[in-house]
């Protein structure tokens, strides 16, 4: 545990697991993605873009399909959330999609360290933009493809909002029910000898209750309210177009049934890590996306396996 964490969250502090996870992954001083975490063959985990160029090439073809479906607009905006080091954008650029001449590709990433990597091997990179710069970028009419980075996403998008393996890294709570409509959650408490889980009564949003009740009583499961909020906000950013989310997932009941909370995983150096409370900021924390929690909030136009879509 870093001294920075100890200073900001002294002994006696208690927080929800969602608060803890967000800090452990994204805090600017010691968060995993803000300091040491990185995808890729030399990083801590592999996603499809890091395996090779084929995924990016197939997704480039999918972007062309969406561009044609929108009537081939003169400016076609792709906003990729959780862009990491920019590998997917580079793969799409290398594939030379037909929409490239009008493409404005914005890589949205919370981590300044990750954004600093976006210019590597990516031509026509227009910089790390503030809010005014983002609006100017997505509204521009200069020949594309053009790429830019920001921690800020625009509204009024004509194009595609894209997220590849983002939702599994959005902070979630850990809850269970007793079969009678009562819920408990795991909080994180800073005790004298380190961090520990403590159980506390809680309430869940009414829209989640039926889905969570599908799990057996007493089984811990992720409550992915942040993922649902991200999805609804992404849809609100569109004027015309689609949201494409790619991630690994399963129904809530299936996730909860895994023994010993096996769905709660950490990774470091491309290997499974230890307990998520052992050393905040030292590892990736992730879980399967509970797809039925998303569907309960927003009915998808298409939900299919990655193979079926690509």
Question: Which residues fall in each region the model found?
Answer:
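Rossmann-like AdoMet
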Residues: 1-81, 85-157
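Class I S-adenosyl-L-methionine
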Residues: 4-7, 155-310
């Amino acid at each position: 545990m870093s001294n920075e964490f100890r200073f900001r969250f002294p002994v006696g502090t208690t927080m929800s697991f969602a608060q803890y996870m967000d800090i452990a992954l994204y805090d600017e001083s010691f968060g995993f993605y803000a300091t040491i975490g990185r995808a890729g063959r030399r990083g801590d985990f592999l996603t499809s873009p890091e395996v090779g160029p084929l995924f990016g090439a197939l997704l480039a073809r999918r972007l062309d399909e969406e561009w044609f479906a929108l009537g081939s607009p003169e400016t076609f905006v792709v906003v990729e959330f959780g862009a990491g080091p920019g590998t997917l954008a580079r793969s799409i650029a290398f594939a030379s999609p037909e929409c490239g001449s009008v493409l404005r590709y914005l890589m949205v990433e919370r981590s300044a360290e990750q954004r600093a990597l976006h210019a590597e091997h990516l031509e026509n990179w227009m910089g790390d933009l503030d809010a005014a710069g983002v609006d100017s970028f997505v509204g521009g009419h200069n020949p594309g493809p053009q790429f830019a980075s920001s921690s800020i996403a625009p509204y009024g998008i004509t194009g595609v909002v894209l997220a590849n393996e983002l939702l599994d890294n959005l902070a979630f709570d850990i809850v269970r029910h007793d079969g009678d409509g009562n819920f408990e959650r795991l909080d994180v408490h800073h005790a004298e000898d380190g961090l520990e889980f403590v159980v506390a009564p809680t309430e869940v949003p009414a829209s989640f209750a039926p889905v969570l009740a599908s799990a057996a009583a007493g089984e811990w499961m992720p409550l992915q309210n942040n993922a649902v909020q991200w999805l609804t906000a992404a849809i609100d950013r569109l004027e015309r177009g689609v949201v494409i989310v790619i991630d690994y997932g399963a129904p809530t009941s299936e996730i909860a049934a895994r023994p010993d909370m096996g769905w709660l995983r950490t990774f470091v150096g491309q290997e499974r890590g230890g307990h998520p409370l052992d050393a905040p900021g030292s590892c990736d924390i992730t879980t399967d996306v509970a797809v039925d929690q998303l569907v309960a909030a927003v009915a998808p136009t298409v939900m299919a396996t990655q193979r079926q879509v690509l």
